[in-house]
Amino acid sequence: MRMRHKPWADDFLAENADIAISNPADYKGKWNTVFGNDNPIHIEVGTGKGQFISGMAKQNPDINYIGIELFKSVIVTAVQKVKDSEAQNVKLLNIDADTLTDVFEPGEVKRVYLNFSDPWPKKRHEKRRLTYSHFLKKYEEVMGKGGSIHFKTDNRGLFEYSLKSFSEYGLLLTYVSLDLHNSNLEGNIMTEYEEKFSALGQPIYRAEVEWRT
């Protein structure tokens, strides 16, 4: 998907540096000083326009949230959404998921959310999928044993691939749903994509996995 260039994005992010952290590697091992507390940190990789993470932050004020988004033209919308929500427990980073270990110390993160990630359906693009083993290793390095991944998608192929990837990596499957919106799971915060696909009658798939302690 081609992202529309927004020439004002840099200035906007600089004006909202309290939300969009411009030098995240400087806070590696010190994110508690950014939030001013020692609450657990949950990250969303591919935070998109920010509806999910801003909603989670409002719903769970005792958890600190950090959204990771590669595209500057998208993260500006997320920054505005967080700003409008007035949630104080969420920050956003305009970085690549490959750099997670440059930004977080081992064990500094407790949970990773992956919501409607690009499925990269072609076999030659497998290594780009956020549930590929390379990325699972990144998540493990910043979470350590006991960390967990919560994963949602509308793409059945990506879901099946991810379950296999989780299993081969040795992760413990603790929850799975092939139709999330008709399940008994409470407190689900929908993303923008999720609302769109659900309105079309598309089932939403969800899995939760954790590292064995």
Curated annotation (Swiss-Prot):
What GO terms in the biological process aspect are recorded for it? RNA (guanine-N7)-methylation; tRNA methylation
- Show the active-site residues: D118
Give the Enzyme Commission number.
2.1.1.33
Per its record, the protein catalyses: guanosine(46) in tRNA + S-adenosyl-L-methionine = N(7)-methylguanosine(46) in tRNA + S-adenosyl-L-homocysteine
Q: According to the UniProt entry, where is the signal peptide?
A: none
Question: Which keywords does this chain's UniProt record carry?
Answer: Methyltransferase, S-adenosyl-L-methionine, Transferase, tRNA processing
The UniProt entry's GO CC annotations, sorted and at most eight, read: tRNA methyltransferase complex
UniProt region (Interaction with RNA), positions on chain: 124-129
Pathway it works in:
tRNA modification; N(7)-methylguanine-tRNA biosynthesis
* Molecular function GO terms recorded: tRNA (guanine(46)-N7)-methyltransferase activity
List residues binding substrate.
K122, D154, T191, E192, Y193, E194
One Pfam family recorded for the sequence: Methyltransf_4
Give the protein's function: Catalyzes the formation of N(7)-methylguanine at position 46 (m7G46) in tRNA.
Q: Record's family?
A: Belongs to the class I-like SAM-binding methyltransferase superfamily. TrmB family.
This chain belongs to the protein called tRNA (guanine-N(7)-)-methyltransferase
Query: What is the species listed in this Swiss-Prot or TrEMBL entry?
Result: Bacillus subtilis (strain 168)
